[in-house]
């Protein structure tokens, strides 16, 4: 019986089960050759589905490889460097015209300067950017009639700036500054044209072409470390920027106070100069009067009489003679007193 059972042909169900057990496992990767494909079994629908899936995966793998090859070819193409400012080179700012009138402030800037100092006094623990944000929010919510006050002041300041600028443009200082600015602009253009006209050395050009492009694959530890370093650098730059803004605000306030102090000192200097000129005129008139009144009073022991040029020396010598010989100089003293009484009258 056992031999008979083993010799009997297998049924269709046994054939399907045996085929499933002996068939190759499902496709787990991308195959580029057709030799590893499973044989075709028309009586097994499961194998047909597996072969279709394998063929689809194979085609998609070939397409991916083709696309990756195209990407490699594109990456291997030399990348031309865009024109622009040279890395690491700083732009030079044009020198400021110190003689020019002060630029006008807008209404918002006036409100911000006034309100910012109040907030820094009331809330010293709040950082500078937060104060700026609070001031901006208050300005947007400020009523129109209160906001109009700052806008009117800004308009007056603008009119003042326009008048002062028109007056300044007619001065020699502005003409000198304008000529210097034009000469600097011409020199800069000539330097740029000279740099463009000089051919690049072939050796330097080959070095630039062979220089590797900084490329880090994503989803790697190196990329994460690079991102962390950049984020730390950005945080440090933001912190430095905030500190510089606060320092700039403090320096701006100090500059304004220094300007007001300079203006006050200039006004005091003008007053003192006017007072000095008046005193100089009065002194000159006193010298003339003394010279005229003391023409007949010589210094004791000499025949020297005063003149307009020697009146100061004459008065000094006369005083020394009177103090040295007071008894002999009583007549001269009485005469000088009469002259001075007439002068005071």
UniProtKB/Swiss-Prot annotation:
Residues 101-169 bind DNA. Residues 1-124, 167-198 are annotated as: Disordered. Its main location: nucleus. The keyword Nucleus applies. Residues 80-94 have a biased composition (Basic residues). GO terms for molecular function: DNA binding. CDD domains: HMG-box_HMG20A. SMART domains: HMG. Residues 32-48, 57-67, 167-180 have a biased composition (Polar residues). Residues 112-124 have a biased composition (Basic and acidic residues). Keywords: Coiled coil, DNA-binding, Nucleus, Transcription, Transcription regulation. Residues 227-290 form a coiled coil. The keyword Lipid biosynthesis does not apply. InterPro entries: ChromReg_NeuronalGeneExpr (IPR051965), HMG_box_dom (IPR009071), HMG_box_dom_sf (IPR036910). It is found in: Nucleus. GO terms for cellular component: nucleus. Plays a role in neuronal differentiation. This is High mobility group protein 20A.
């Amino acid at each position: 019986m056992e031999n008979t059972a083993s010799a009997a042909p297998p049924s269709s169900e046994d054939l399907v089960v045996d085929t499933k057990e002996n068939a190759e496992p499902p496709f787990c990767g991308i195959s580029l050759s057709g030799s590893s494909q499973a044989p075709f079994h028309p009586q097994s629908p499961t194998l047909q589905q597996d072969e279709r899936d394998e063929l689809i995966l194979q085609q998609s793998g070939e397409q991916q490889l083709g696309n990756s090859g195209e990407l490699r070819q594109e990456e291997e193409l030399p990348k031309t460097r865009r024109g622009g400012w040279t890395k690491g080179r700083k732009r030079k700012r044009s020198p400021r015209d110190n003689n020019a009138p002060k630029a006008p402030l807008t209404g918002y800037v006036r409100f911000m300067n006034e309100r910012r100092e109040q907030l820094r006094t009331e809330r010293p623990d709040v950082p500078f950017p937060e104060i700026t944000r609070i001031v901006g929010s208050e300005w947007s919510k400020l009523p129109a009639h209160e906001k109009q006050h700052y806008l009117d002041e800004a308009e007056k300041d603008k009119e003042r700036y326009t008048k002062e600028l028109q007056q300044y443009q007619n001065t020699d200082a502005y003409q000198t500054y304008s000529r210097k600015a034009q000469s600097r602009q011409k020199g800069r253009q000539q330097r740029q044209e000279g740099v463009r006209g000089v051919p690049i050395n072939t050796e330097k050009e080959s070095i630039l072409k062979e220089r590797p492009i900084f490329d880090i694959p994503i989803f790697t530890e190196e990329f994460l470390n690079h991102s962390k370093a950049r984020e730390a650098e950005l945080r440090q730059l933001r912190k430095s920027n905030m500190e510089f803004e606060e320092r700039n605000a403090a320096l701006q306030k100090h500059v304004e106070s220094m300007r007001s102090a300079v203006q006050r000192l200039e006004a005091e200097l003008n007053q003192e100069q006017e007072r000095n000129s008046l005193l100089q005129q009065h002194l000159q008139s006193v010298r003339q009067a003394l010279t005229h009144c003391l023409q007949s009073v010589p210094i004791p022991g000499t025949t020297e009489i005063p003149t307009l040029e020697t009146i100061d020396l004459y008065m000094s010598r006369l005083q020394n003679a009177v103090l040295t010989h007071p008894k002999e100089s009583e007549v001269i003293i009485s005469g000088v007193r009469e002259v001075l009484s007439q002068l005071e009258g």
